[in-house]
């Protein structure tokens, strides 16, 4: 029984895999996937920041709603990260990488009302939803595009729920 090579080939940035997709398609998909991993990690942490620190009208409903959003966001980021590795890449998921590379605006830590948090969340959910929708058409790997489409559907729904609670 032979084992897979766990080294990069001399001519490639990728780890060896028997996946025969062409290298450029893999590299482009990995780059797009890592961008989403970074954004989704940031969005999951932002969601938890709001979840912990909000106060006011509709607290419990929004507090519990955000838990469900975060669970789905983490599931998507895990799917993206695993796809990166399937293609021979390295998933970039450390806090240091996220801090350095997130395109999201820093989340304010000095807000407390449910309404302030909903507005701040809507801005960031909207940014990620718009970015992933664009990424769907930019990747040549149909499996990656399908993953992005599934995440886009969830983000659009979450954004709708958030915006529906803004007074």
Swiss-Prot record:
<dbReference type="GO" id="GO:0008199">
    <property type="term" value="F:ferric iron binding"/>
</dbReference>
<dbReference type="InterPro" id="IPR023188">
    <property type="entry name" value="DPS_DNA-bd_CS"/>
</dbReference>
<keyword id="KW-0560">Oxidoreductase</keyword>
<dbReference type="GO" id="GO:0003677">
    <property type="term" value="F:DNA binding"/>
</dbReference>
<dbReference type="InterPro" id="IPR009078">
    <property type="entry name" value="Ferritin-like_SF"/>
</dbReference>
<dbReference type="InterPro" id="IPR012347">
    <property type="entry name" value="Ferritin-like"/>
</dbReference>
<dbReference type="GO" id="GO:0005737">
    <property type="term" value="C:cytoplasm"/>
</dbReference>
<dbReference type="GO" id="GO:0016722">
    <property type="term" value="F:oxidoreductase activity, acting on metal ions"/>
</dbReference>
<comment type="function">
    <text>During stationary phase, binds the chromosome non-specifically, forming a highly ordered and stable dps-DNA co-crystal within which chromosomal DNA is condensed and protected from diverse damages. It protects DNA from oxidative damage by sequestering intracellular Fe(2+) ion and storing it in the form of Fe(3+) oxyhydroxide mineral, which can be released after reduction. One hydrogen peroxide oxidizes two Fe(2+) ions, which prevents hydroxyl radical production by the Fenton reaction.</text>
</comment>
<feature type="binding site">
    <location>
        <position position="82"/>
    </location>
    <ligand>
        <name>Fe cation</name>
    </ligand>
</feature>
<dbReference type="InterPro" id="IPR023067">
    <property type="entry name" value="Dps_gammaproteobac"/>
</dbReference>
<keyword id="KW-0479">Metal-binding</keyword>
<keyword id="KW-0408">Iron</keyword>
<dbReference type="Pfam" id="PF00210">
    <property type="entry name" value="Ferritin"/>
</dbReference>
<comment type="similarity">
    <text>Belongs to the Dps family.</text>
</comment>
<dbReference type="GO" id="GO:0030261">
    <property type="term" value="P:chromosome condensation"/>
</dbReference>
<dbReference type="InterPro" id="IPR002177">
    <property type="entry name" value="DPS_DNA-bd"/>
</dbReference>
<feature type="binding site">
    <location>
        <position position="78"/>
    </location>
    <ligand>
        <name>Fe cation</name>
    </ligand>
</feature>
<keyword id="KW-0963">Cytoplasm</keyword>
<keyword id="KW-0226">DNA condensation</keyword>
<protein>
    <recommendedName>
        <fullName>DNA protection during starvation protein</fullName>
        <ecNumber>1.16.-.-</ecNumber>
    </recommendedName>
</protein>
<comment type="subunit">
    <text>Homododecamer. The 12 subunits form a hollow sphere into which the mineral iron core of up to 500 Fe(3+) can be deposited.</text>
</comment>
<dbReference type="InterPro" id="IPR008331">
    <property type="entry name" value="Ferritin_DPS_dom"/>
</dbReference>
<feature type="binding site">
    <location>
        <position position="51"/>
    </location>
    <ligand>
        <name>Fe cation</name>
    </ligand>
</feature>
<keyword id="KW-0238">DNA-binding</keyword>
<keyword id="KW-0409">Iron storage</keyword>
<dbReference type="GO" id="GO:0006879">
    <property type="term" value="P:intracellular iron ion homeostasis"/>
</dbReference>
């Amino acid at each position: 029984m032979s084992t897979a090579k766990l080294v990069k080939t001399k001519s490639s940035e990728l780890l060896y895999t028997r996946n025969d997709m062409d290298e450029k398609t893999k590299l482009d998909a990995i780059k797009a996937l890592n961008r989403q991993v970074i954004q989704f990690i940031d969005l999951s942490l932002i969601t938890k920041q709001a979840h912990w620190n909000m106060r006011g009208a509709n607290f419990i409903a929004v507090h519990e709603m955000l838990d469900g959003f975060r669970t789905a966001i983490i599931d998507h980021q895990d799917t993206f990260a695993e796809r990166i590795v399937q293609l021979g890449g390295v998933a970039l998921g450390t806090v240091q990488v996220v801090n350095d590379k997130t395109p999201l605006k820093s989340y304010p830590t000095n807000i407390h009302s449910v309404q302030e948090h909903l507005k701040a969340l809507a801005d960031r959910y909207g940014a990620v939803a718009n970015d992933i929708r664009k990424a769907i058409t930019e990747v040549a790997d149909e499996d990656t595009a399908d993953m992005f489409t599934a995440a886009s559907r969830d983000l659009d729904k979450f954004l709708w729920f958030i915006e529906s609670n803004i007074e």
